[in-house]
Amino acid sequence: MEEKTLKISKIKDGTVIDHIPSGKALRVLSILGIRDDVDYTVSVGMHVPSSKMEYKDVIKIENRSLDKNELDMISLTAPNATISIIKNYEISEKFKVELPPKLIGIIKCKNQNCITNTREPVKPEFEIVSRHPLVLRCVYCQRTMNERDVFE
Amino acid sequence: MLKNKSVVSIDDVQNDDLFEIFDLSESMLKTIESKGNAPLLTNKIMATLFYEPSTRTRLSFESAMHRLGGSVITVSDTKTSSAAKGETLADTVRMASSYSDIIVIRHPLEGAARLASRFTSKPIINAGDGSGQHPTQTILDLFTIKKELGSIDGKVITMVGDLRYGRTIHSLIIALSRFDVKVNLVSPEILRLPEYVYSMLPDRNYVKEYNDLEEVIGETDVLYVTRIQKERFSDQNEYQSVIGSYSINSETVEKMKKKSVIMHPLPRVDEISPDVDNMPQAAYFRQAYYGVPVRMALIYKILGD
């Protein structure tokens, strides 16, 4: 029913990212590396009325699936986002993104003096201190990062 | 239990271990003063990797191991070691761990000791990592407070100076959250305790910030003074703006309780005037003296039977 209220047409095959907090769609596009040189169709709905969230953003991407790193990154900015895998206009799989207990190797520590920002053979590693608001702690240097630090 | 465990942060030392170390430190102190040595680790080797200048910490670790009957191998100058050739810390630690039973590391980068602990099964002791933590100094500081004042609980601890970069402050304030204490923080605005350290405290109610030492000097049991560290500032103008912000002299001490102490992890520059040195409150040289028995106790807890 909700789909009828959306001003974005259905896609045949690809991925729908729904329940993105209103205003965060551009950040999600940036996470997915979607710029002006894409060769697939991307539909973005911003500030769409939602029964669950009052307003939300929605992204539909034709002929593209998301990998685990991308899903983890999306969970940092849109912790309640739902992902629908579309095959031949039907939802073949639907799930919520999940913030993992640890983030390993997907973001850099903002502390320039952290040992992980050197040639050492380790991946940056973060524990989740808080989900709302997002606070991550570097396992190595103990510095904390918020959402803005992660995406700046 | 600390047996064969690394001590990277003060959180690696539980209260039970802490009190056992205090008791053992007292025994070690008596042994040093009566016999000189306690040959309990005669077959053990300690490697010390110091990538940053150090006098007290390095000497006290090496002295502690010698007094326990163990041996010490060291890189006397990292500029002449493989680090200068571009060897990673991970590789150096792998190598050093095959030559020794325990590794003590000091490094200018935060997280270095945690990284080291991931590349060896041998215990790592963090002797200071950048502006991160300095857990063995904290054990020593707590021991000093207990020895000088009889207990830690019920005391008012005033920390003054560089609270932003001071790793001894960071470890100590986290450890003090386990005790019934009040902590006053006195520093210039730009050297306030960082938010990430606050976020490691179970609650903030025992900590209060002040600009003026005069406001809290009269209620202070422990005045913990730190050097404003030139080497931690990327902006030297910022350093120039805060140097000499607080100077403790005999007039300051006159306002303190009779039974109170002044502590300092040392080295000092000009934050404590020499005219304080012979006053009964000046505990900083005694604090440095306790460094050997406390580290003997810690090393024995990790490597002993």
Swiss-Prot record, chain A:
UniProt cofactor note: Binds 1 zinc ion per subunit.
Gene Ontology MF terms in the entry: metal ion binding
Keywords: Metal-binding, Pyrimidine biosynthesis, Zinc
Binding site for Zn(2+): C109, C114, C138, C141
GO CC annotation, single: aspartate carbamoyltransferase complex
Any one of the GO BP annotations: pyrimidine nucleotide biosynthetic process
Cofactor(s) the protein requires to work: Zn(2+)
One of the Pfam families matching this protein, by short name: PyrI
The UniProt record lists the keyword Chloroplast: no
Quaternary organization: Contains catalytic and regulatory chains.
NCBIfam families from the UniProt entry: ATCase_reg (TIGR00240)
Family: Belongs to the PyrI family.
Primary role: Involved in allosteric regulation of aspartate carbamoyltransferase.
The name this protein goes by in its record: Aspartate carbamoyltransferase regulatory chain
Originating species: Thermoplasma volcanium (strain ATCC 51530 / DSM 4299 / JCM 9571 / NBRC 15438 / GSS1)
Swiss-Prot record, chain B:
One Pfam family of this chain: OTCace_N
Entry's EC annotation: 2.1.3.2
Molecular function GO terms recorded: amino acid binding; aspartate carbamoyltransferase activity
GO terms (BP aspect): 'de novo' pyrimidine nucleobase biosynthetic process; 'de novo' UMP biosynthetic process; amino acid metabolic process
Residues bound to L-aspartate: K85, R167, R227
Gene3D superfamilies recorded: Aspartate/ornithine carbamoyltransferase
EC supergroup of this enzyme: transferase
Catalyses which reaction(s): carbamoyl phosphate + L-aspartate = N-carbamoyl-L-aspartate + phosphate + H(+)
UniProt keyword terms in alphabetical order: Pyrimidine biosynthesis, Transferase
Coiled coil: none
Protein's UniProt keywords contain Transferase: yes
InterPro entries named among the record's database cross-references: Asp/Orn_carbamoyltranf_P-bd, Asp/Orn_carbamoylTrfase, Asp/Orn_carbamoylTrfase_sf, Asp_carbamoyltransf, Asp_carbamoyltransf_Asp/Orn-bd
Pathway(s) this gene product operates in, as recorded in its UniProt entry: Pyrimidine metabolism; UMP biosynthesis via de novo pathway; (S)-dihydroorotate from bicarbonate: step 2/3
Keyword Disulfide bond included in the entry's annotation: no
UniProt-annotated binding residues for carbamoyl phosphate: R56, T57, R106, H134, Q137, L266, P267
Entry-linked HAMAP family: Asp_carb_tr (MF_00001)
Cited function: Catalyzes the condensation of carbamoyl phosphate and aspartate to form carbamoyl aspartate and inorganic phosphate, the committed step in the de novo pyrimidine nucleotide biosynthesis pathway.
Family indicated by similarity: Belongs to the aspartate/ornithine carbamoyltransferase superfamily. ATCase family.
Assembly mode: Heterooligomer of catalytic and regulatory chains.
Name used for this protein in its record: Aspartate carbamoyltransferase catalytic subunit
